[in-house]
Design a protein with these regions (language model features):
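C-terminal single-pass transmembrane alpha-helix
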Residues: 349-406
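Extended, non-transmembrane interaction/recognition domains
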Residues: 47, 51, 55-358
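N-terminal hydrophobic or amphipathic segments with adjacent small-residue motifs
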Residues: 8, 15, 367-371
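N-terminal signal peptide
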Residues: 2-4, 10-33
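Extracellular/luminal recognition modules and glycoprotein regions
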Residues: 22-43, 355-362
Length: 406
């Protein structure tokens, strides 16, 4: 079989597999917990055929997300008074979850990139400012939900750290979206989501910088709390893509996987992942011309796990039990050499996916397959027509020679 034929078979198999691999859809249910319009807490459950994904978001204290996979009948109970005080086990499920993962926006870090490297230099602490995420004042801007998707938009317009007397103006916008089918998100960078994942889009807009810093850049530290093996580090795995159809100019997806762990038989089992494309946009247009790079740093284990989650919603669920689970941080900084620093546009974005289970793999779209097919098929058609022309011309010449020989 020729190489061209093999490629055509591969393209045909890709189209068939995309049509057969229908995702399992979930049904969304919004439940009001602790009815108080001033609260910045939201709860959703997404029911599948055999299990339920619970989502809790809280922006009081450190902004945090809890995802829990449970059996279908499992319900959530929040003791509102205790939860407001961030007390131990104020969040309880009626049955033990199959798996949980918590994400905390732990810190917003401003660093003075005096050497224009776009990398944080921890050796010089004078060039680093840590903004506590719990000192931002958040408000809910909008919440939308339909049969197979939801959207929550939060915004913080003021920073006030009472312990240090530091205040900052500017806006941090957080958009959380879930789509319960396999598809790319509708906004750039068009991340691939599944029915078991959600998207987080963060925007740092006109954040007031340190007056003594001439070359300010920003970084975000996430803290991950996971039921996996606490002794293993999370895995950071950059993956190359075949094309940049969904995110122009970007041929890579950075993937962070948690080390799944089943204590009963000590086998790797449940796990979660984060995914993002290594690009940050410097304007609302989110075009290639207004983009810069993202730098990811190795994960770090958190030593005092209880203290780390104390001022977040996650303490209300894990409590003292957090000592026995994985708690690690990852740091992401924004910018590249000679991009003008944060002050060039005073606008920076970061978009990432949080998901349960196996991360989805990018597939060639119908458009790309069509273009490849045309690119491969056209030369074959030309070769066939040329061969047919040569054959007809040769047969015609033979017929003429035979006639003359008579």
């Amino acid at each position: 079989m020729s190489q061209v034929s093999l490629i055509y078979l591969f393209l045909l198999f890709s189209i068939i597999s995309m049509n057969l691999a229908g995702p399992i859809k979930r049904t969304l249910h919004y439940e009001e917990k602790c009815n108080n319009t001033n609260w910045t807490t939201m709860y959703l459950r997404a029911d599948g055929l055999n299990n339920t994904l619970h989502y809790i978001w809280d922006f009081g204290g450190k902004p945090s997300i809890l995802m829990a996979l449970t059996s279908l009948p499992t319900t959530l109970n929040i003791t509102c008074e205790d939860f407001a005080l961030k007390k131990n086990h104020s969040i309880v499920f009626s049955d033990n979850p199959i798996y949980t993962i918590g994400i905390v926006i732990n810190k917003i870090i401003e660093f003075n990139d005096v050497n224009n490297t776009a990398v944080i230099n921890y050796a010089n602490t004078k060039n680093i400012n840590v903004l506590k995420s719990e000192s931002f004042v958040w408000s809910r801007k909008s919440f939308t939900m339909n049969g197979d998707s939801f959207g929550l938009n939060m915004e913080a317009n003021f920073y006030n750290d009472t312990t240090t007397n530091i205040t900052r103006r500017g806006s941090i916008k957080a958009s959380l979206k879930g789509y319960y089918f396999l598809e790319h998100t509708d906004s750039i960078p068009h991340m691939l989501h599944t029915e078991n994942s959600m998207l987080v889009d963060l925007i740092l807009d006109k954040i007031e910088t340190n007056e003594t810093f001439s070359s300010s850049r920003f970084a975000i530290e996430l803290m991950i709390v996971d039921g996996g093996n606490p002794d293993k580090l999370m895995i950071i795995d950059p993956k190359k893509n075949l094309d940049d159809e969904h995110t122009p100019g970007i041929f890579e997806v950075v993937e962070v996987r948690t080390p799944g762990f089943n204590r009963s038989n000590e086998t790797q089992q449940n796990c979660a992942y984060l995914q993002w494309r290594p690009v940050s946009y410097l304007s609302t247009s989110r075009s290639i011309s207004s983009s810069t790079e993202i730098v990811q740093y190795p994960p770090f284990k958190v030593n005092d796990r209880v203290a780390a989650i104390k001022n977040s919603m996650l303490y209300g669920y894990y409590g003292q039990d957090v000592k026995d689970v994985l708690v690690q941080t990852i740091l992401i900084s924004f910018g590249s050499k000679d991009d003008g620093f944060y002050k060039s546009t005073n606008y920076t974005t970061w978009t990432f996916i949080i998901g349960y289970g196996t991360p989805p793999d990018e597939q060639l779209s119908y458009l790309v397959i069509l273009i490849i097919s045309i690119g491969l098929g056209l030369p074959v058609v030309i070769m066939f027509l040329a061969a047919l022309y040569a054959y007809i011309r040769n047969m015609s010449k033979r017929h003429t020679d035979t006639y003359l020989n008579r």
